[in-house]
Amino acid sequence: MDVTKKSKRDGTEVTERIVTETVTTRLTSLPPKGSTSNGYAKTGSLGGGSRLEKQSLTHGSSGYINSSGSIRGNASTSSYRRTHSPASTLPNSPGSTFERKAHMTRHGTYEGSSSGNSSPEYPRKELASSSTRGRSQTRESEIRVRLQSASPSTRWTELDEVKRLLKGSRSASASPTRNTSNTLPIPKKGTVETKTVTASSHSVSGTYDSAILDTNFPPHMWSSTLPAGSSLGTYQNNITAQSTSLLNTNAYSTGSVFGVPNNMASCSPTLHPGLSSCSSVFGMQNNLAPSSSVLSHGTTTASTAYGAKKNVPQPPTVTSTGVSTSATCTTSVQSDDLLHKDCKFLILEKDNTPAKKEMELLIMTKDSGKVFTASPATISSTSFSEDTLKKEKQAAYAADTCLKADVNGDLNTVSTKSKMTSAENHGYDRGGGGGRGKGGGAGGGGGGGGASGGGGAWGAAPAWCPCGSCCSWWKWLLGLLLTWLLLLGLLFGLIALAEEVRKLKARVEELEKTKVLYHDVQMDKSNRDRLQAEAPSLGPGLGKAELDGYSQEAIWLFVRNKLMTEQENGNLRGSPGPKGDMGSQGPKGDRGLPGTPGIPGPLGHPGPEGPKGQKGSIGDPGMEGPIGQRGLAGPMGPRGEPGPPGSGEKGDRGIAGEQGPQGLPGVPGPPGLRGHSGSPGPQGPPGAVGPQGLRGDVGLPGVKGDKGLMGPPGPKGDQGEKGPRGLTGEPGIRGLPGAVGEPGAKGAMGPAGADGQQGSRGEQGLTGMPGTRGPPGPAGDPGKPGLTGPQGPQGLPGSPGRPGTKGEPGAPGRVMTSEGSSTITVPGPPGPPGAMGPPGPPGTPGPAGPAGLPGQQGPRGEPGLAGDSFLSSGSSISEVLSAQGVDLRGPPGPPGPRGPPGPSIPGPPGPRGPPGEGVPGPPGPPGSFLTDSETFFTGPPGPPGPPGPKGDQGDPGVPGTPGISGGLSHGASSSTLYMQGPPGPPGPPGPPGSLSSSGQDIQHYIAEYMQSDNIRTYLSGVQGPPGPPGPPGPVITITGETFDYSQLASQVVSYLRSSGYGAGLSSASSSEDILAMLRRNDVWQYLRQNLVGPPGPPGPPGVSGDGSLLSLDYGELSRHILNYMSSSGISFGHPGPPGPPGLPGTSYEELLTMLRGSDYRNIIGPPGPPGPPGMPGNAWSSISVEDLSSYLHTAGLSSIPGPPGPPGPPGPRGPPGVSAALSTYAAENSDNFRSELISYLTSPDVRSFIVGPPGPPGPQGPPGDGHLRENYNWSSNSSARRGTSYSSSTGTGGTNGGSLGEGGAYGAGDGGPYGTDIGPGGGYGAAAGGGIYGTNGDSFRDGFTGDLDYNKLAVRVSESMQRQGLLQGMAYTVQGPPGPQGPPGISRVFSAYSNVTQDLMDFFQTYGTIPGPPGQKGDVGTPGPKGDRGPAGPRGPPGPPGPRGNKGEKGDKGDQVYTGRRKRSIAIKP
C-alpha cells in the first residue's frame, strides 16, 4: 500500500510516501561479490539517478522510501515467507535464511532538507556500530544518542520528534545506534519497524538525508540487514519497477526486502553485487551511498570506496553482530566486509550482547574520508535497546516462533558467541552473512553467511533446527532435497491413489446406476403389465369412484416411475445454477498478490526518484569511480614526490605546458610557476582541457626517460586539474592522479637502468677468449693447434693405445649427449675410451672402429687445418667442422683422456685396428674448426678423417677421440666433439672455498700431488678424458710438416671447388652439405694424401686401452689423495660450506692465473689455446679472454673470489657452508667423502689436471669412418652453435649438467666448442643450465647414460657437492681439490673440463701470458649485450611523471579534485 502525501515541514515541502508493504522474503544468501544476486543488474538503478527513490530493501521489511520525502517506516513483520531466487548467484549459506514477512509502513520525508531532492548532506559523523553498547538502553536514550550523533541540526532536540521516535509501534528504529564518537548520521526519525528482525535479517532500512538528519530516514537506506551471506536474495528489477521485492526473484514481496539501493539508484549496486562500478557506491559518492552496496558483493571494491567522498554514510551502518561475530567467515571479504561495511546487521540479540568478534567496520567519516574501524564492529552496535527492539522482535517473532531462530538459522552460531537463550535473541548469524560462500569462512558464517548467505531456503538450517549451527549448508540442502523428493513421491502416490479411487467410485456409481435402471425397468414393466391387465376389467361405465385404491396406487407408481425416468434423463434438472457461485472461486487471491507488487513499482518511481536525479549528477562522478581505481595507483604518487625536483624541471618545460592552457584559459600557462600552480589549481576549471594535458603526460612515460622530461607539459595538465573543479573535471582529475601514480612506478623502474651495468657481465662473457680465437681459427688458429700438438705427446703416453681398444665403447660416447640428430659426443675425450672403442662397433661407430686404426692418420687430421682453410675460404667447412666439433687433426687426442667417456662415446677407437676405415679421416677438414686458436678444437679434427688411410697410424688416435669421435678418422674433430667437458663440472665444487688464497694453496697441493709420478702413473689411465682438447694440435702432413688447418681447409675447399663443389662451399653451406662433400671418396682420398691424421692429442686418454680409467680403483686413488692431503697438512671439511660456489667454477682468467701461479705451471702450461674451441668459430673470433672472463663473472663466476685458482672463485659461494662442519662431515662421512673425492678426481677436469695435456691421443681420431660421419652429423648440429656439441646430447642440460644451460657442452650457450662463446648457455651451463652441477647436473648421466663412469662421477660429484657442499668444504680446507675444480670454472667457458683443462694447460705453457690480452677484448664484448637489458631503464623515465603526481595533488587543492583523491584513498583503504 503506497500512500503519498505532501506536507510542509519547516517550510520545506516534503512529499512523504507512506509505504506499507508486506514483504515476505527469505534471503537465501548474498550473492558473492561480483555477482548480482538475482542477475538483475537493473535492480539497483532507480530510473536513472534523477530520482532518488530509495528503496530501503531491508530484509525484514522492504519499503520503498521515497527519497524525495523523508521516510518514515513502520515495519511490522508478519509471517515468514521463504523466497528463493533462482536467478541469484548467491551461494546458499546454511546459516542465514532470511525468511520473514515484514510489514512495514514508512513515511518518507526528508525534513530539514533544503530541497526535497537535494542530496542529503551527511554530518561528518562516523557511523560505527560498537558492540560496546552493552547496556540496554531505553529506546529514548538510544534515539537521543542517535539524533545527537546523526542530526546536523538541533531539531533532533525537538520533543515532538523524540516522542514520535519513541512511539512504540513505530519506533523499531531500524536505524542503527551509533556511538556518538563515530557514527554516520542516522535518521533520527527512522521508524522502521522491522518486527521480524530475525537474527541477521533485521535490516535497518533507513535512508539518511544528511540535510535532514531528523528526517525519518535520510536518503540512505540502511539495508544492512542482509547478512553478507544473504544479500538480497534476488533483486528484481523491481527496484526500478519499484516493486520492492528485490529479494524475491519471484517478486512475491512487492517491496524488495533486500538490497536497498542507495540514494544513488544508479548505484543500487546492492542489487547487482556484480557492479564494480558501484563500488563507489560503497563509499557512496557524495551521499550516494549505495547503502545497499553491501548487497552488491561484486562491489567489494566498492567497499573500498567505502569511505566515499564526504557524506558517505555507509548506510549499511547497521551491522549485525552475527556477521561480525563469525570469525570463521573466511569469506569475510565477501560477506563480512559487506556486512560490516555495507550491511551492518542490527543485532537483534540482547542489547548487551557484545559483539564477540571484533569486526572492524571501516567507515569513512563524511569529511575526512578516513576509515574508522570500530573495533567491535560487531553488529551488536546496532543492538536496539531491548525494550524497543526486543519487544518488536518478540512481536514479530510471535507470529512465527519457529522462524525466530536466526534468520540464518544458526542460532547456535550466534549462541556460540552468546547463546541466545530465547529465539528473540537470534544473534544475527554470526556468520551473518559470514558468507561461507562456498568456501566462505568456515565459520562462520555462522549461518554460513556466505554459502547461503543466510540463504534461508537453502543452506541455512531452519531456525527450529536444534543443530542449526552444526549442520552444514550442504547437509541441509541435501536434507531438503531428500525431503522434497519424499514429498514429491508421496504427492505422486497420493495422486495415483486418488486416481484409482476416482476410477473405483466411477465404477461403483456406474454399477449402481445400472442396477437402479434395471430395477426401474423391471418396475416399470411390471407396472405396465399390471395396469394393462387391469384396464380391460374397467368397464366403460366405470367412474372414478370405481378406481379402487389399488388402481390409484398403480397409476401413482407409474407416474412416479415416469418422473424418475425423466429426472434421470435430466429433463427435470435445472437447479445447477447455484454452482455458478462455485465458479466465482476460480479467481484466487494469489494472483491478486502479484498485482500488488506491480503497484509498488510505480509508487517508487514517482517523486522520490526525481530528487535523486541530482544525485544522478553525482552518478557522473561514479564514472570517475573507475578512475578511482587508478587512484589506487595514486599511492604511487607519493613516489612521485621525489619527482618534484623533476617537476621543477618540468616547470621549465612549463612552456610546453602552456599548450595545456590552450584548451582552457591561459591558466595552464602558470604551470611554469607550477610551484604556484597550486593556486592555479582553483582556476583549473578550464582544467577540463587540463585533463587532456595529463594524458599527454602519460605519453611521456611511454617515451621512457626522455619523455619523462617532456613530463613538464604534464604540469600543464595540472592546470587542467584546476579545470577539474568542474564536477566533471573531478573524474578527469582522478584519472590524472592515477596516471601519475603509474609513472611513478615506472620511475622506480628507472633504476633498472642499472641493468645496463649487467652488460658488463656480458664482458665477462668475453672471457670466452676461446671465442675470439675462434675467428682466427680459420687460419691463424690452426697454428695454436700445433701447440696442442705438444699435448699430443702426452697423449702418446701410450695410454691412448689402451683407449684404442675401448674406442668402440666410444660409440656409446656418441650416445652420451646427442641432442637429437647430433649424436656426436665430443670424440676428443673418448680418446682414452678408445680402448672402449670396441663398443663403438655396436653403433654406427662400428665402422668408426676401423677408422680407429687410421687414428694415427689423425695427424692427417692436421690437414684438417686445411679445414681451417675451409673457414677462410668460406669458413663454411671450418665452421661446420668447428661447430660440429669435428677435429680434422689429432684433436681427438685430448679427448683421449676422456677415453673413459669415450666408451660411452662411439666405440670407434676400438676399431682402430681397422685403420682402413680411418678413411673417415676426411672429416678432418672440420679441423678447421680450430679456426683462430692454435689449440686444436676437437671438432676440427674431424675433417682429417681423409687421412684415414693413415688410419693405421690411427693407433695413437685411438686414445684420443676414440669413442666419441667415432669417426675420428672422418674428422679428428669428432674427438673434439667428444669434449668430455661434462666430467669437468664436478670440479667446480672445489672453488667453493671462498678462501681464494686457500683455494690456490689447495690447487697447489693437488697439482703437486697429481704431478707426482706415482699419482700420474696411477692416474695415467684416467687421462683419457682430456679428449676435449679436440683442438687437435697441428696436423702433420705426410711429409711430417706441421699442417696448417687453414691450409688444409683451403686445399680441401680448392679441391672441392675444382671438383665442381665450389658452389656448395659458400659460407652459407650447411654442415650437412660440407659433410656430404667431405664424405665423398675422392675427397677422402685427397685428404688422406694431405693428412696424416690427428696427432697425439688423444695422449691424455690414459684410460685408453681397456678403459683402465673405468677400471681404475677410485677408492684407492681417493685414499692416496686423501693421504697425500693429510700428509700435506691439508684438512678436510672446514671449507665444506662453500661447496655451492663450485658451480661457478673458475673463470677462465682465474684458471689461467691459478695455473700460471701453480708450481705445475709446466704441467698445466698455458692451455689457453682451448679457446679455439672456436667451434662457434666466428663467435670465437669476436670473443677475447677478457670477454670470456667477463662473461664468466656475469654468469656468476665473478662472485668467485679473485684467487685465480679455480677453487678461489667457487670459494665465495662456499662461504655459506661451515668449514668446521665440513671437517666434521668429512670425519663422519669419510667414505662418502672419499667416494666424492674419487668422483671428483676422476672427473675430466681433475683428470686433465692429473693427466696433463692429453694431446697425444690425437691419433685416435682415425677411428671409425662411420663415427666420423656421425660426428659430422652430430657436430653439424652442434655447430649450429646451439652448444649442442657436448651437452647437446643431453638437451638443454648439456652433458655437463646443462654445461651450457641451453648451450651444448662445449658449445656453451650458443656455443664455442668449449662453450667459450658461452652464449646463453655458458661453458658449464653456469649461465643458463645452472652449471654442470646445476639442476641439469644429471645431464652428465643422461649424456653418458651409463657409458662413462665419468659422467656418473661428474653427476655424483656435482650433486653431492651441491647437496652436501662436501667437496666445496674440502676445497676450503683442501685448497688442492679446489684447484681441479677450477677447471669447472672453466667449464663455464668450456663444456668439457678435461679437454679444456688440457687445452688451457697447453695454452698456458705456451702462452702463459696470453690470457691477459684477451682480457682487453673482454672489454669490447661487455656492455653491449647488457645494454639491452638497459631497456628496463626506459621505465625509469616514467619516474618523472611521478612528480606530476604531486602536481596532481595541487589539483586536489581544487575541492573536487581533493574529493576524488579522497575517494581514491578510500578505495585503497578498504
Swiss-Prot record:
Residue ranges, compositional bias (Basic and acidic residues): 9-19, 1446-1455
Q: Where is the composition biased (Basic residues)?
A: 1460-1470
Repeat recorded as keyword? yes
Residue ranges annotated as compositionally biased, kind Gly residues, are 430-452
* PTM remark: The intracellular/endo domain is disulfide-linked. Prolines at the third position of the tripeptide repeating unit (G-X-Y) are hydroxylated in some or all of the chains.
Q: Which residues lie on this side of the membrane: Extracellular?
A: 498-1470
Residue ranges for the region (Nonhelical region (NC16)) are 1-573
Annotated region Nonhelical region (NC1): the residues are 1457-1470
Identify the domain of life. Eukaryota
Q: Where is the composition biased (Low complexity)?
A: 60-74, 742-755, 781-803, 850-873, 1275-1290
Which residue stretches does the UniProt record annotate as biased composition, category Pro residues? 597-609, 827-848, 891-914, 940-949, 982-992, 1166-1175, 1201-1215, 1253-1262, 1434-1443
Q: Where in the cell is it found?
A: Cell junction, Hemidesmosome; Membrane
Q: Where would I find glycosylation on this chain?
A: 1273, 1395
Q: Main site of residence?
A: other
**Annotated TM spans:** 477-497
Chain intervals for the UniProt region annotation (Necessary for interaction with DST and for the recruitment of DST to hemidesmosome): 146-231
Region called Triple-helical region, residue ranges: 574-1456
Q: Where is this region: Disordered?
A: 1-155, 167-193, 422-452, 568-873, 885-999, 1159-1181, 1194-1220, 1249-1298, 1406-1470
Listed GO CC annotations: basement membrane; collagen trimer; extracellular region; hemidesmosome; membrane
Q: Which residues, renumbered to this chain, carry the PTM Phosphoserine? A: 551
UniProt cross-references to InterPro entries, sorted A to Z: Collagen (IPR008160), Collagen_superfamily (IPR050149)
Provide the function of this protein.
May play a role in the integrity of hemidesmosome and the attachment of basal keratinocytes to the underlying basement membrane. The 120 kDa linear IgA disease antigen homolog is an anchoring filament component involved in dermal-epidermal cohesion.
Description of how the protein assembles with itself and partners = Homotrimers of alpha 1(XVII)chains. Interacts (via cytoplasmic region) with ITGB4 (via cytoplasmic region). Interacts (via cytoplasmic region) with DST (via N-terminus). Interacts (via N-terminus) with PLEC. Interacts (via cytoplasmic region) with DSP.
Q: What is this protein called?
A: Collagen alpha-1(XVII) chain
Could you tell me which species this protein originates from?
Mus musculus (Mouse)
Q: What broad taxonomic lineage does this protein's source fall under?
A: Eukaryota, Metazoa, Chordata, Craniata, Vertebrata
